[in-house]
Curated annotation (Swiss-Prot):
Name of this protein: Putative F-box protein At5g15670
F-box domain segment(s): 22-68
PANTHER family associated with the record: BNAA05G37150D PROTEIN-RELATED, F-BOX DOMAIN-CONTAINING PROTEIN
InterPro entries to which the protein is assigned, alphabetical: F-box-assoc_dom_typ3, F-box-assoc_interact_dom, F-box-like_dom_sf, F-box_dom
Organism per entry: Arabidopsis thaliana
SUPFAM superfamilies: F-box domain (SSF81383)
Pfam families: F-box, FBA_3
NCBIfam families (UniProt xref): F_box_assoc_1
Amino acid sequence: MMRRRNKKTKTVISNPETLEERNKFDEIPHDLVIEILGRLPAKSVARFLTVSKLWATSIRSLDFIKSYPLGSSSKPRTLVASKQVVANPSTGRTIPLPRVKTRRTIATSFFGYDSVSDQYKVLCMTVKAYGDLRDESSQHQVFTLGAKKKSFRMIDTSIIPHRPCSNGVCIDSVVYYVAKTGAGMLHLCIMRFDLSSEILDLFTSLPQEIRPPS
């Protein structure tokens, strides 16, 4: 004898207050929502990626990324790593960079966004840790994130001997940094690296009254 089982049905009762709050929230102009998101910390913005496809697309858009403030009023955090990585503070994701092939011992890297090719690039400069600083040569290599070739590639540069002494700043696909140059590396200048053409050159010399850090 076969017994017939009754199928249980599950009834979901929506909370009227929750639906009302969501309807009110949807009435907020999207431009105002983007303005509000731009004032939030990066970690908070990342949480809103799952709200809807529209929000995720807007947050990942180039316009929102460019308009998002670089600075933060909170205390800076330190990332400790045994090798070079590119880190996304909003998601906590890190991408390890390939090893730089060189016999030189000092490496300085700069990171920037190339709006022409829509790619992120890393410029690595390597110099010797010994020798005559007045005649210091350097090598420059570039790594493109997302490229098929997962390695740095050497670029041709014919520039004045210099040694970086500051972090880089990327503005309109150009990375700028302060460097020591001149006799005994006692003068300061601003170097620039065009991420699109991959050309490194001298942007300007700083007044002699400005002394390099010891």
